[in-house]
Each structure stands twice: as structure tokens, then as C-alpha cells.
């Protein structure tokens, strides 16, 4: 009980200095969500951005992380219109990640999608399958954190297929729960989203 309280106090102490930039990010995400954008990330970061904005998660990439080349393959497939490879996950094809005690979808010998917050494959598949259709008709903003076996060189092809691609690095990038408590990381992402919004305003004036 005491340790839990102490951890909560420490978390709040780290959270307070980032509140202004988190509010700014929430405003940016709401504006981009209203403009028809969707966030994709290789870890929980996209989901946390929607939480900052108080919006439903218009992305399947929440509560999970990709390993190895699985994220690059995912990005390339959906940009090519091959969403059928990913639009529906069968829980019977999933395994359990023994270290994390959660559901996992293997996509290769050393790659896969780890559903960190979902212990049961049925729940993980249901969450993914309900959220994936929300990407339809939306322009994607891609966030790639260089960690969990994801190297920037793996993303070279995917970068050419998306107008808005943000790389969080250098490797190893902070995990999502640390990233959202780091003012420098949040400021860099906010500056990137400012550029996306500015491009949208410029396009609207033409």
C-alpha cells in the first residue's frame, strides 16, 4: 500500500512539469482528429495521444507494441491497400508472450505484435478488430519509436508512402509511458504536429 502511494506521488511529480505541453498536444490531436487524420504508432503512444485529447482511439495501435520488422511490414501493407492482411485478427492464430503474460501475434521468427494490456487473445483480437475500421478514409500520421528491434533502416520504404512520418529516436527511444513524461520528447512531437497543422491550413488557402 505504501509503495503504491509512493509510486503515485513520484508519477505525479514527474507529470506536473509536462502538463502545459500535454494540454497543447491534446489541442493538436483534437484539431487533427476533426480534420480527418488518424495516428499510428508502434507502441502505446498513439493511444496515449488520443487519451490526452479525450477522444476515442481512431487507431488499432493502442495498448500494444510491434517488434522487429513487423511495424514496417504493417505500414507498407496498409499503404499498398493490402489492409486485408491486418484488418481482422483471428485469436486462434495468437500465442502468449510468456515474459509479458499477454497476447501476441507472431508475424515472423523475431517479430510480432505484443498486446501488452490484453492478457487474453480473444480480448486483444476484439479490440484490434473493432478499432481497425476507424482508419478508413483518414490520412495517417505515423509515429515510429526506434526500440524493440525496430531500426530506422527498416522504415525507409514506409517513409516514402506517408506524408507525415515522425521518428522518435535515437535508438533506443523511450518507451511510451516514459515518452509522455519527458518534456523534450513531447515538445519535439508537438512541433511536428504544428507543421502538419500548418500544411493543412496552407492547403486550405489554395
Role assignments for model-derived ranges:
Residues 40-93:
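Adenosine ribonucleotide-centric catalytic and binding domains
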Residues 1-34:
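Membrane-proximal basic amphipathic "stem/tether" segments
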Residues 26-39, 45-46, 54-61, 190, ...:
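Solvent-exposed alpha-helical segments and adjacent loops
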Amino acid at each position: 500500500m505504501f509503495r503504491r502511494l509512493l509510486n503515485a506521488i513520484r508519477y505525479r511529480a514527474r507529470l506536473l512539469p509536462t502538463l502545459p505541453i500535454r494540454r497543447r498536444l491534446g489541442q493538436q490531436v483534437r484539431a487533427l482528429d476533426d480534420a480527418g487524420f488518424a495516428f499510428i504508432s508502434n507502441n502505446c503512444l498513439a493511444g496515449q495521444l488520443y487519451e490526452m485529447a479525450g477522444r476515442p482511439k481512431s487507431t488499432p495501435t493502442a495498448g500494444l507494441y510491434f517488434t522487429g520488422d513487423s511495424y514496417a511490414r504493417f505500414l507498407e501493407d496498409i499503404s499498398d491497400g493490402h489492409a486485408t492482411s491486418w484488418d481482422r485478427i483471428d485469436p486462434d492464430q495468437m500465442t502468449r508472450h510468456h515474459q509479458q503474460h499477454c497476447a501476441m501475434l507472431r508475424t515472423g521468427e523475431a517479430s510480432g505484435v505484443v498486446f501488452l494490456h490484453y492478457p487474453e487473445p480473444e480480448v486483444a483480437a476484439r479490440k484490434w478488430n473493432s478499432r481497425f475500421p476507424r482508419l478508413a478514409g483518414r490520412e495517417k500520421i505515423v509515429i515510429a519509436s526506434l526500440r524493440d528491434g525496430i531500426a530506422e533502416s527498416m522504415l525507409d520504404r514506409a517513409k516514402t508512402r506517408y506524408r507525415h512520418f515522425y521518428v522518435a529516436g535515437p535508438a533506443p527511444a523511450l518507451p511510451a509511458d516514459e515518452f509522455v513524461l519527458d518534456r523534450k520528447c513531447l515538445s519535439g512531437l508537438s512541433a511536428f504536429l504544428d507543421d502538419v497543422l500548418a500544411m493543412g491550413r496552407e492547403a486550405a488557402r489554395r
